[in-house]
Amino acid sequence: MKVELHSHTMRYSGCAVSTPAQLMTALVKQKYDAVYLTEHDAVWDDWELDNLRRDFPGLRIFPGVELTLPHDDHLLVLGTNDREYLTLRHPELILAKARQAKHLTVLAHPFRWPKAHSLLETGPLPDALESRTHNSDAHAGEQSQAVARQHHLPLVNAGDTHAADTLGHFWIDTYADLVTGGEIYDIVTNGMYENAMKKRK
């Protein structure tokens, strides 16, 4: 399955420029099979997700969130819209809750700015690191790869998509179907996927 792990819409992310419908339309056009909605410090309610799924029945739409941590690093929590995550301030509590529930945690764009990888220095560690995204260049990807080797963490490509017209540069292809959003935990932690990127012309 072609999967977008990291996406934003105008509904809940002020930095995004596409509506949910615009983003879903672009995902379908580019033959994505699944997407995680990871708004900044906000989650979609179940009824909102259900409405979006009805409008785009060929796309598997899953919840998630991008949390801003105290040192300004960002953590994706995938497969959940549990609002308790929005109230937790300490990374230790967030990661403990996620691990117990098997919600995949991914340190987003860890080398996009100086403090974006603070969690790797203070611990505890997330389940995975982002490697390449639309907003992280090849050098940042190389830095992520080096740190992932050091800590024995999986790497995932993601769009970090804020606009429909920037979609389709980086994603993962999974070896197994995602039926529920939570299944991404086992897929990534067991290496049942490949990182993919748009081929240069």
Show where each model-derived region lies.
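Short acidic, glycine/proline-enriched helix-loop-strand junctions
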Residues: 44-62, 151-156
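Surface-exposed amphipathic alpha-helices with a cationic face
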Residues: 2, 28, 50-54, 90-106, ...
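Charged catalytic cores and adjacent phosphate/nucleic-acid-binding surfaces used
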Residues: 1-5, 9, 13, 21-25, ...
